[in-house]
Amino acid sequence: MDRKHNPANTARARELRRDMTKEERKLWYEFLRQYPVRFARQKVLGRYIADFYCARAKLVIELDGSQHYIDTGPDKDRQRTEYLEQYGLRVVRIPNNAVTGNFTGVCEYIDLLVKEAVTSQGSPV
């Protein structure tokens, strides 16, 4: 990951941690915060800020609201994903409505992704 990032992103990440969406808040406080493998929220990764990041699993979780599906949203998301993937990170996009409508399924999916990634690296969860 290139170390050159916009210093304003650090302050912005702090703001985003303080002002999480209701879906981010739910996923963080009801699942990821206590998850046995550490996740960070609103993590600066190069020139981007990831919603949730698990270094051990090399996994980025992005929660996508409606703005991600209109205008330039899909193109920006594709650029972000390509940027992060070139550093060996897996980027997974989860729609906000999946968090509110199928929370258990979302948690099971994330759990599966983390376990697959960590065990493929040769260490138990």
Regions found by a protein language model. Give the residues of each.
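Nucleic-acid endo/exonuclease domains
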Residues: 1-125
